[in-house]
Design a protein with these regions (language model features):
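Active-site cofactor/substrate anionic-group-binding motifs, chiefly glycine-
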Residues: 68-70
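A residue-level structural signature of the nucleotidyltransferase/glycosyltransferase Rossmann-like core
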Residues: 6, 14, 50, 72, ...
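Short histidine-centered beta-strand/loop micro-motifs
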Residues: 39-45, 61-64, 84-86, 115-116
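Cyclic-nucleotide recognition modules
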Residues: 73-121
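Regulatory nucleotide-sensing modules
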Residues: 15-51
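Local beta-strand/beta-hairpin segments that build beta-sheet-rich folds
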Residues: 40, 72-73
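Non-catalytic regulatory/interaction regions at protein termini and inter-domain linkers
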Residues: 1-16, 22-24
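Glycine- and acidic-residue-biased ligand/ion/polar-headgroup-sensing regions
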Residues: 37, 47-66, 76-80, 96
């Protein structure tokens, strides 16, 4: 497992990519600001972007009967949103919102799929 000390990312997943894999995805990464309460994913909707959080926290929220919601997960700088994309899916299982305003690296799902397929060979 790699842990590159000289790369300009705080996200633990990006820091652990091999130098070759990181070089192949960097042209497709874009740093974006994510204000608090920004909706990153919506239940049963197509996942538009995968976010590698650099700081802050995203909340994963499940819809319950009778209009109630419950938090089922948190994503921080050690993870990413859109994990279903890595498994071949394209739709979100839950809503995901930014809880704390911070920055992230945005990535198109198609590039994420290609990276995962290459890594599994």
């Amino acid at each position: 497992m790699f842990n590159q000390p000289n790369i300009p990312y705080q996200n633990a997943l990006l820091r652990r990519l091999s130098p070759g894999d990181l070089a192949s995805i960097e042209p497709n990464l874009e740093r974006v600001a994510l204000p608090m309460r920004t909706q990153l994913e919506s239940t049963k909707s197509v996942i538009e972007h995968v976010y590698f959080l650099e700081d802050g926290i995203a909340s994963v929220v499940a819809k319950l009967p009778k209009g109630r919601d419950t938090e089922v997960g948190l994503i921080g700088m050690e993870g990413m949103t859109g994990a279903l994309v890595a498994l071949g899916g394209d739709r979100a299982a839950h809503d995901t919102y930014m809880q704390l305003r911070e920055a992230a690296c945005e990535f198109q799902p198609r590039h994420c799929r290609l990276l995962c397929l290459r890594a599994l060979r």
